[in-house]
Amino acid sequence: MTDDMDKVWPTGLTLAEAEEVHKQLIDGTRVFGAIALFAHFLAAIATPWLG
């Protein structure tokens, strides 16, 4: 088996592919965080004992 120097260990992705996956993961995390923040804000408003 020959080693491909363009691949990133241990995934086997190229550096460009790994960066693309990372960007999508970060974008998804930001969307999830924004939705969670909004949901917590609504829950705090709707909960009578929190004011």
Swiss-Prot record:
PROSITE patterns, A to Z: ANTENNA_COMP_BETA
Name of the protein in its database record: Light-harvesting protein B-800/850 beta chain
Signal peptide start-end: none
The keyword Oxidoreductase appears for this protein: no
Name of encoding gene: pucB
Pfam families in the record: LHC
Keyword Cytoplasm: no
Domain of life: Bacteria
